[in-house]
Amino acid sequence: MPTAAAAATASLRVSNIPPSAVAAELLAFFDSAVAVAGGAFACEIAAAHRGWLSRGHGTVQFGSAAAAAAAAGLASSGRLPRFLGALLSVSPSPVDLLPRASDLSLRAAGAGLVVGDRVAERVFEAADAWDGVRAEVIPGKRRVDLYLEHDSQRYKLEVLFEDMKDCLGCTLDGMGAILLQLNYAPRIHTAISGPAVNSRFMDDRFHACKEDAKFSWVRALDFTPNYSFGRCSTLVLKLGKSALVSDILKSLPFSGNLGELTMNSMDGVGASSNVVPLVHCPRDYSVPYEVLFRLNSLMHMGKIVAKHVNADLFKALQELPVDVSRRIFEKMHKLESTCYGPLQFIQQEAYSMKRSHNVLLSNEGEGEGERKLMKCYRVNITPSKIFCFGPEEEVTNYVVKHHSAYASDFVRVTFVDEDWSKLSSNAISARIEQGFFSKPFKTGLYYRILSILKKGFSIGPKNFEFLAFSASQLRGNSVWMFASNASLNAGGIRRWMGHFENIRSVSKCAARMGQLFSSSRQTFEVLRWDVEVIPDIEITTDGSKYIFSDGIGKISLRFAKRVAHHVGLDPTNLPSAFQIRYGGYKGVIAIDPMSSIDLSLRPSMKKFESESRMLNITSWSKSQPCYVNREIISLLSTLGIRDEIFVAMQQDEMRETEEMLTNKEVALSVLGKLGGSETKTAVKMLLQGYEPSSEPYLSMILKAHQENRLTDIRTRCKIHVPKGRVLIGCLDETGVLEYGQVYIRITKNSKEQKDSNQSYFYNDDGKTATVVGKVAITKNPCLHPGDIRVLEAIYDPDLVGMVDCLVFPQRGERPHPNECSGGDLDGDLYFITWDDKLIPEKVDTPMDYTATRPRIMDHVVTLEEIQKHFVDYMINDSLGAISTAHLIHADRSPLKARSPECLQLATLHSMAVDFAKTGAPAEMPRTLRPREYPDFMERWEKPMYISNGVLGKLYRSAMGHMEKSGDSGALSSSSAQPSPTYDPDLEVPGSDEFLQAAEEYYELYEEKLTTLMNYYRAELEDEILTGNIRNKMLYLKRDNKRYFEMKDRIVAAVDALHREARGWLLSSRKEEDASRMASAWYRVTYHPDRRRGKRFWSFPWIACDNLLAIKASSQLRRRRQKDDDSTAVVQMDCSA
């Protein structure tokens, strides 16, 4: 829900305007009619494009909200004069024609602006300054606009309220001023004018404005000679009048009054590069790269100021071990305000650590699990700044793993907007010219990104240059870069990856280069003679060639067992298929029990030539829970599934979510659908006999998942389908399946194992069963009604070994995977349900997903062409906009997803998906762009309508259920520390001697977990354990993809910490002492005599298996004692 009501605008909608009227006349009419300060400011009359005729209505913007209210008052009271003989009708307008402060007291002309750094509490160093600045505070848009001139060019700076770290009133040389300490640089725009520029307020009969508005604002780079906006983080706005300062501060997120501010000029030379701010180690000193990188990160996060990063600081750091510097920096990251004395802080912390032996514990247990995790350095580059992050835990990829000796020379670079949100295409390439042959205007951001890709950038001694990008990185505007050295350079890595010279399509060549950067686990090198190439299964229908075996091969049973054991799977419970990367091959390999060859690969799996023989596993077949989402619900509704069915499913889901806090069986059922190590611990605790609300750690985890689940239901319509799965697609190698048939054998969940009334299961062995009957199948994303296929699931004994995968036939006019959103068998996951209520009686003809042929070059693709393709993708990436528009048109049209608009958008979406490989962009026409957004999208900043479709009904049903339950999306109980009940069953004899060590380990764990919480901005323990951050940063709220990527990093970091802690448990101790240490961990965390304030309940449960073994032993001992007592009573009765 919106946090506050939107501020009133200064505009009115005006109707009944005479057809002959021009905007200048209407503007003058209202300006004379309204005798309030500000008068009328701008006017626009709506016009039909054909014939350029007036539509008889328009918008008038006034100089202030008070003037607009006066005009509305005149109209409502009948005192507004007639305009050209017509009686005008007015109503409030939700938006202004031009963004301006609606209150005159929130405008300041002739102000001064200074950019620089706050180097002490009341000391400011100025880097650049301007006079004659106009400031406008716009509370409705929660931002401040600053207008200024520099070298005769007009600029506008936008500062969002959310970007302000501190907003302080102060005085400067006796004048009133406002100090804004920012987390990010302001968004910079420049004015572009000219005869061909398409300004909203050109000289024509339907537009008029009192000020010069015949120009367009486009995004620009830092225009100062020394990149002051990039290097610095503080603005000072000099206003003069104390009354004006007071009025403006009332509308800003005011932090307090600073008093008199001392201003000095900034010393030192300007930046040598436009990638700022970065500090470098002086020549006379030397610190490890990790220390320098973390030091830059502290500066970028506003914890220290560049001025204080001097030779004395580097001298102090040079004398410290890396792990000590790391821990000190982690403590600095926890500071809520800027540290103006970093040298003193470092010296004091180093002295404290020297006296404590805890520092010796910090590395114990590290290294475990290194096979699948790596330390990754990340960088965000914005239009003005650079931000350093990490190193962070991530699942490794083959390229970095193979070159692990140079792991710190790799960096993942993401190009983002100033506040880390996704850069809009209009920020990179703006359409400002009018005319049929007009070309987009490439802004400075386009050339900045291209320049960094071509020339690279430096951090300390490392000069990073472009390497490659994976498909997911391309979608996230991210690339890998590498710092070349005497032994290895980026070109050498690309040559090692494979031979790409024969790929003459720029987009395909770029995609193939990124293939080995997928997160994967390395297994074995498979030699040439252990690999065979088998033919693809193809058919040509109506001139189109289809490959039924597109992306799938085979693996022998013997070799599959070796692979499964290597990646930590149970060889007695083998997955039926693995998703792989092998040299230039990618796709899926399914187990063939009859094969004696390790790998049988097909030509459709081969993407390029490579000398690499390492088999990399990216995933494997598994039983995954099935959920409907907005897209699937929209299509099923189009195909005739009634709204009441979805509402009933949602209510069942929410009822189960409520009961998970009180019902053990329900809690186990819900956790069974989730992943993550913390759910495994919770499941073990429930199975051991703990009640959901009886134990603080267990209760905390359950409440966190309950809250996240309710949020998903409300915001994403994510509803569980019990009679369904999400499975990887495979091929029927036996040829027994006919067109229209599939084979589905699944691993049954605990609920299915207990339910004997399941007519849709056949050949049920208790653990697995084959689904038989009608099934509905699709693949996300799905926009066309024909993406939903209804097929017949059958049983065949020849396929009984294929478990937890969807087996498609190799017969027919067209492959079924291709009918589902243009899917294939190289790892695509498919939604399957055998719930009769969700299976349509009739389906639509599937869409033709034949991709556009990529443009073929007459030369070997160059690195420059790949880099340009990356930036062009940023400009043309329209997937999100198309998906959103499709949902809205389907919601509003009686034809739903069959409407012409939706069908056109489905075609565009297919083109947009293929753009990464074809290079052919999908441009959405303006006529398809939504003007209003439904309530279920919660886009409060946009014009909104109440949805009457199924998604609107589900949204309001969820909101009503939450309000009835006293929950509006954030469970208040989650923020409170649970009331712990100490469990004496977890005490063991001999644990007393471990209490002192346990206390020290707890303090170390607390320090490390708090560091992670601070780094990822998690306020509570359950947030960092589950990765479900409640108060997400604004850019994460807007970008689900990047939020889920961050969530993966959080989970990886917590898993790494828990592995390290398990190392503490076992380090230098006998195995039998582990139980006593685990008991001591529990006692120092839970015992009333040892609890001091806030506790991290997760600490002892890192040793979950040890504690539950103690619990089981205590329960068994108590039962035996009870049996002995009962026997004694019986014997006494008999003797009596």
From Swiss-Prot:
InterPro entries: RNA-dep_RNA_pol_euk-typ (IPR007855). Residues 967-980 have a biased composition (Low complexity). It catalyses: RNA(n) + a ribonucleoside 5'-triphosphate = RNA(n+1) + diphosphate. Keywords: Nucleotidyltransferase, RNA-binding, RNA-directed RNA polymerase, RNA-mediated gene silencing, Transferase. Residues 965-989 are annotated as: Disordered. One of its GO terms (molecular function) is RNA binding. It is an enzyme of class 2 (transferase). GO terms for cellular component: nuclear RNA-directed RNA polymerase complex. Probably involved in the RNA silencing pathway and required for the generation of small interfering RNAs (siRNAs). This is Probable RNA-dependent RNA polymerase 2. It comes from Oryza sativa subsp. japonica (Rice).
